[in-house]
Amino acid sequence: MKSKELNLHTLYTQHSRESWAGFGGHLSIAVSEEEAKAVEGLNDYLSVEEVETIYIPLVRLLHLHVTSAARRNQHVNVFLKHPHSAKIPFIIGIAGSVAVGKSTTARILQKLLSRLPDRPKVSLVTTDGFLYPTAELKRKNLLSRKGFPESYDVKALLEFLNDIKSGKERVEAPVYSHLTYDREEGAVEVVEGADIVIIEGINVLQSPTLEDDREDPRIFVSDFFDFSIYVDAEESRIFTWYLERFRLLRETAFQDPASYFHKFKDLSDAEADTMAASIWESVNRPNLYENILPTKFRSDLILRKGDGHKVEEVLVRRV
């Protein structure tokens, strides 16, 4: 039976916003409105009420997984007579469409997890830095496919994750500039001594094709994850958020002469909407249906958003 014929929803317990809020228990992590606003993505929305209702229970669940993994690793190291093995970070993957709010979810989780009683060190890395540089994309004739699986240096991403899970003390990731639409030459994101690492990106639950992996062992990015989250919403909502974000960028970042999109700064509202819709239909929508949405049920937890970026339902995988 093909996977698309399976009712994969049965793999998950489903929780309404109201019932999920009750799982926060006695965990209390203070977050001010200013702090919530500071981690918002462009055109995203995050209130203290959203933090308390959705993210505090999620952090409590994640903490259970983190502590359980630490105990298991300790027992295995004793069994193998390696009681002083290197610290292995717990890795959380966050996936979902462009404009769905992954970055906001990643940043608020980083803030909340770092405020747990044991004060873990939490690092956040986005996979944007692993996009091939623009010059390389042009050379490979992939610029129009930017964001699709083939536009990422997956080998470098896998090496980065392998170093983390191998206990390497200091690991570096390339940094991406949304202003120049390219890697920042010479800039790196350093992961050093982390207890938890969050990896955020549209591609993190995707698997390579047989052709891509013909020469190498079939290792997926998600093989390195201890827990994965998919941020979900109806396509119509995501498109609306994308359109609104494009308008805001035209009024802000596009005005900067250093912006890759500076040439679009004087577009009228109608012209901006037309361009955004064209990009959505030619790039983001196909990528969503071909590569991102099919990975949803590979995640351990799904955050399903409704109007205003508010999470309406949480699905937690049973196995």
Curated annotation (Swiss-Prot):
Gene3D superfamilies named among the record's database cross-references: P-loop containing nucleotide triphosphate hydrolases
Task: Report the source organism.
Answer: Bacillus velezensis (strain DSM 23117 / BGSC 10A6 / LMG 26770 / FZB42) (Bacillus amyloliquefaciens subsp. plantarum)
- Upper taxonomic classification of the species? Bacteria, Bacillati, Bacillota, Bacilli, Bacillales
| Annotated GO CC locations | cytoplasm
UniProt keywords, alphabetically: ATP-binding, Coenzyme A biosynthesis, Cytoplasm, Kinase, Nucleotide-binding, Transferase
Cite the binding residues for ATP.
Answer: G96, S97, V98, A99, V100, G101, K102, S103
Q: What is its main location?
A: cytoplasm
**Protein family per UniProt:** Belongs to the prokaryotic pantothenate kinase family.
A GO term for molecular function:
pantothenate kinase activity
Q: List the disulfide bonds.
A: none
Catalytic reactions on record: (R)-pantothenate + ATP = (R)-4'-phosphopantothenate + ADP + H(+)
Q: Is the Protein transport keyword given for this protein?
A: no
Name the chain's protein: Pantothenate kinase
Q: Which Enzyme Commission number(s) are listed?
A: 2.7.1.33
Where does it localize? Cytoplasm
The record ties this protein, via CDD domains, to:
PanK (cd02025)
Which N-terminal residues, if any, form the signal peptide? none
Metabolic or biological pathway, per its Swiss-Prot or TrEMBL entry: Cofactor biosynthesis; coenzyme A biosynthesis; CoA from (R)-pantothenate: step 1/5
Q: Which domain of life is it from?
A: Bacteria
Name a single GO biological process: coenzyme A biosynthetic process
